[in-house]
Amino acid sequence: HDMSIGEVGHCGVSISSIKDMERLFDGINLADVSVSMTINGPAAIIFAFYVAVAEKQGADISTLNGTLQNDILKEFIAQKEWIYPPHESMRIITDMMTFCTERMPKYNTISVSGYHIREAGSTAVQELAFTLADGFSYVEHAMEAGLDVDNFAPRLSFFFNSHLDF
């Protein structure tokens, strides 16, 4: 699209295919590094590329470390950059939490982000309230899917921007 001219790769790395992911990590052994990705709507696709590249490198995915932001609820609240409706988005995230809990227990599947909520105009109290509510929603959905809270909750992280005025 004409509007994308000059914007691709301007904010982060442009990953459009598994070949892009292979190029990104060429010469980097994914088993030896922690990879954090600030990606939300397309997180499942980008994460699948990452896992496939790690497997192609011969990595045991159960030992991989890293974090996905993967906070779709924040997208609905603050950034307005979602792909799927809320219910379907939560199902995808819960499926990813299940996959990582079962196969990649060292990987953080969600970094619940208040930062963007604050940047969208909330007060510090609102940022904290929305972010914790989002975190509770992820936990509730995972438990409804049959995950044991003790197996997945330690892998959740939070990212705040509440400044000194909380």
Language-model features and meaning:
Residues 1-166:
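Catalytic alpha/beta active-site cores
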